[in-house]
Structure formats: C-alpha cells, structure tokens
C-alpha cells in the first residue's frame, strides 16, 4: 500500500537503527516480522512503535550488558518520533517521490537529529566526544579524512598509551615471524572503510583489546563498555552514510550541524519542490474540487452525486498518467470513500477510508485530519471497535485527534456516541446506518440536519 511512500515510516526508522547497530540478529524473529510488516504498511500505531523500540533496540542492547545505552537509545527514538510526526502531519509532500524528498530530509532533518543525539550521549557520559564519533573531516599530511571507526580505534589506543602508526597491530599481538594475522587485516579494512565491522567482530576485537597488558595496567571501570559502545555508534554512522551517499556526504553534514545547528523551515523547502513540479499540484487542485463536491456539510441530491462521480472518474483517469501516480492516490481513495458512504456502501467505504488515511499521513498534510474524522465517524456508526481503537491511537501518534473527543477511549457501548459527537461538530450530513449491517438501504440512512455544526477547528 505504501510502496512509494515519500516519507520513511516509523517502523522503517526502527529497522534502519537496528540494522545500523547490527542488533537485529539479537532480536526475537517474531518482532522482526512485525517490524517488516509495519515498515511496508506505514502503520503509525503508537503502541506498535513502542513495542518495536523495546523488542528491536532496547532488549538486544540490554542483552549485550549495556543497559545505560539501551535506555538512552530507546528514549532518543521516542523523542525522534515526537519530532518527526509533526513534519509528517504538517508538511505536504504531495507529488514528491521518495528520491526527491529524501535529499531534503537527509540534509535538513536527519543530519541535525544525529548531531543532537551525539551531543546528548556525550552530555550523559556514554561517549567521550560527539566530534570523535563523527570522524575527522580532514586527514593529516594529505591523507583522506578518517572515518568514525578509525577515529574511535585511534582514540582508544591513544587514551591507554598504545598509540601507533599501525593501529591494527597495536590491538592484536603479532606473530613472531613479523607477519600480520587475519584479524589484523580485518581491522585494517574497517579503518579504511572498505568493510563494516559486524556486531560479533566488534565484540571480539573489544575482548582482545582489553586483554592486552597496556590496557589492563591503566583501564578504568566501564572502559570496555565504552569502547564497544563507541564502535557500535561509529559503525551505525558509517552504515547510514553509505545508504545516503547518493545525496551527499552525510558525515560532513553531521559535522556541520555539530559546529552550528541550523534552523531550517523544511516545510518551505518541500513546498518549493512541490510547486516546481507544476502539473501534479494542478491535479491535486482537481482532486480537492472533487472532494469538496462530496463533502458532508450539506445534503446531496442524486444529480449532484452523479456529477461528483463523473468528476471523480476524470480525476482518477488523469492521476493514472502521472509520472508519480502515488502522489495523489490518497486523494483518489478519499473521494471514493466519500462516494461509497453517500451510496450507502458502508463496508466498502470503511475499507477505503482506512487506506486513504494510511497513505494521506505521508502526503496530504492537514487533510489527513479530515480523513481521520470521517473514518472515526463511520467506524463509530458501524460499531467497529477495533477500527475505532486503531484510528484513535494513530490520531494520537500524529497529534491530529479532534480535541472534542478529549480522552474518550472506544468501548463496546460508545461507538455511536463518538460518531454523534463528530457528526455534530464536523459533518452534519454524514450518512449513518441505523443498523450495524455493512450495507443499509437509503431508507435506513439518517442525517442530523437539525444540528448546526460547531466551530470545532480543534
């Protein structure tokens, strides 16, 4: 459904961090499957996100014996969600495919977020220096810039008096014949950036290093965990940089943010890119006209519905010919859901509303809230408690749940109450079945014509 989602989903973010730290191998296979499904569907369920952070990040890191890092990383991911959701809910990336949106997100959102995380970890004493983790942006004597893994290893050796021009040989005891063993060559490849260390190889090199005489004579309590933690974070940074390499030097972006944190209106940058595309924006306007023709602020005659259906057919046909048809699929589906509701096909309408909402949170901006309101209204009318619960949790995660609902939670008895509240406030002519059957006859429909909609901008 969200194969072409412009924004990386929440579950994709968890999956990326788990892969960057190489801790997926320590996670429960069922949790991995749940994460992959959520990444594909783009589910914004807050409870699911919390479970994924717990199962995919906190517990694997805790099993390594590094509970402080596990705790801080879980807290950081929760904080990231609170920063990221407003961007998704506020900024319309309508008509921007992922390959056009990601460069903006990488440079103006993700790099700054990583810099903030490194500063936080330094502040709480889990790493020695944020600058150390970002690598050296300038090499010595014409050498290429040092990568994070290389700077961490060199700093570790220097701290314990084992600094050497041949860092890999300093970590491992060398054979008497002067040759370099396989492990030493492996570390050389890490430091050059030709390969990334795995979690298992990091644990092995840490165990080897802390057994050397120069370390045992000078180390402090917690030094082993610090070295392993810094190597994991350095690996994660290089892993991320390799994935976004087509969009620029990510490590240099992070270093720039460490030097001076920029305040950028990402919404303005995305809007400029959207308007530069031209044609899709015009098509979006046609879609909004179609949606307006099917809204629930006033009653509709059969003639008006037929005209709206013809407009929808035209909108759907034009959308298929876009270079990026997924840019307006949420709007097409939303209009189809509204038309199905007017035609009393409530079962189909419910399915379409859920699809429209799931795709709209990535591209529609504020319209996602309107879709959520209508989906909640229909789910309440049909007594669909699982749908209500899921939609309410997603609305809370996106911070777009109507304030008129307060802290109301879906119960077996209050579905109709939720529907009535939303109908009176937002959609006075929303068709509602008098029974819980998926499809009711026109005679079974009722509207609250006598109710004047409240000014419920919240």
Tell me the role of every PLM-derived stretch.
Residues 74-133, 177-182:
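Extended, non-transmembrane interaction/recognition domains
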Residues 245-452:
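Extended amphipathic alpha-helical coiled-coil/heptad-repeat regions
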Residues 1-24, 32-42, 103-173:
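A short, Lys/Arg-rich alpha-helix, primarily the initiator
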Residues 138-144, 148-156, 160, 186, ...:
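Disordered, low-complexity "stalk" and linker segments at domain junctions of extracellular
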Residues 210-240:
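Short C-terminal boundary/hinge segments that cap the last helix of small helical domains
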Residues 1-5, 32-37, 173-198, 206:
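Recognition helix of helix-turn-helix/homeodomain-like DNA-binding domains
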Residues 25-48, 71, 87-96, 123-144, ...:
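Extended non-catalytic scaffold regions that mediate assembly and binding
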Residues 1-4, 14-24, 42-85, 198-220:
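DNA major-groove recognition helix of helix-turn-helix/homeodomain DNA-binding modules
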